[in-house]
Amino acid sequence: IRLSLVGSEMCIRDSNGSRLYLDVGSHPEYATCECDSVDQLLTYIRAGDEEMNSLAICAEENLARTAGSGDVYIFKNNTDASGHSFGSHENYLIERTDDFFRISQALIPFLVTRQLICGAGKVLRDPHTGQTSYRLSQRAEHVFDGVSSATTRSRPIINTRDEPLADSSRYRRMHVIVGDSSMAEPTTALKLGSTLLILEMLEEGIEVSDFYPQDPIDAIRIVSRGLDGQAPFLLKAGGTSTALEVQRVFCTAAAHYLETRPTDEQTPRYRWTINLWNRTLDAVESGDLTPISRDIDWVIKKSLLDRQRERYGVDYADPRCAKLDLIYHDIRPGRGIFPLLESRGLINRLTDPTEVEKARTVPPATTRANIRGQFVTHCLDSGVSFSADWTHLKYASSPSTEVELNDPFESMTSEIKSFISHSG
């Protein structure tokens, strides 16, 4: 594990260009390095999971030496028993020249209903009725606005704070904070691939039918309660729609767009995305979820819960259901339900274990993460104090001299190589 504590902010920089730190609420957050493809990002997300597991093992070894024993649990989920929520944030780079407001507004209907294809599932007790039921999304009950600059108290679906973490004259960041933390890699790939396709379409000026909800927050909660995708919500333009209808329209539009889009290295994954997207909608509409029972988190978890309820003759209010809901998100191999199911081939895996192991210490070669990762590695090897964030690198011994990383796609230059070789 090649990690370094940076300054006094409790931020740890990884040699693969990623970041581990304590977020609001003192829970650990792992932020992956910049990636330029879905497959690359899947690999680095998985590398982050394995890094967290390794740190937990180290912590348990330290506890055994100093306190006798102790177990460290790491849950990759979005809510706790006290009603707090922590997000799985997605950051998409878009052109500054595009109309950010137009794209954000057009994206809202897709994001409100996206939980139907990539929700993590949640056993939830309704505080108003006292009834406990199964919902599509963990995050849906914890957002309170459609589009705003807030991130915590009044969480929006899309955060509009203009912090591109890149050349602000060229880029903006589409900061989506409504998503659930996915466990199954196909769910993650569908979440990312579908959103990327829709963003590409919107940047190209391709408009989709107007499904903007009359109240996005009311709509997102209605959708979360409707496992069949058929729960109607009001539209701003009048009438009603459903998650199934909205996702069908977006999926069809994305498929048509992909037919005319120039072929590149992303094309195979995008075709795979359209396939799983359609299969998921078909399965939900038919009521037979078997075709996606190894791919979509909320479906996998629901199957586990249904078997447990049938075995014990209980409903969702039984504490064992809440426990199962939680431990599905335990990332620790040998203990967590998800790692066990995946290891037995009961959940599909997309990443290559060899590539994941490499990604734990080696940054992507195609983004500025390569520069940051090489800088961190050099400093760790040399025992040199340093400071590094998403857009700046500097040695502690010469804080007035720093390198700016404003181009996310610049992976190395001769000038930066010279800077890195300098030991401060």
Where are these regions (language model features)?
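Short, Φ-rich (hydrophobic/aromatic) sequence segments
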Residues: 41-46, 189-198, 277
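Generic recognition of long tandem-repeat/solenoid scaffolds
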Residues: 28-30, 174-177, 393
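Generic recognition of cysteine residues
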Residues: 11, 33-35, 58, 118, ...
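Glycine-rich, flexible loop/turn motifs
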Residues: 1, 16, 132
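Loop-rich catalytic cores of soluble enzymes, especially ATP-dependent carboxylate-amine ligases
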Residues: 70-82, 86-239
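Sequence termini and other peripheral, non-core segments
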Residues: 223-424
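Signature for HUH/AEP ssDNA processing cores
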Residues: 13-72
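Single conserved hydrophobic/aromatic residue that forms the stacking wall/gate
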Residues: 1-7, 11-12
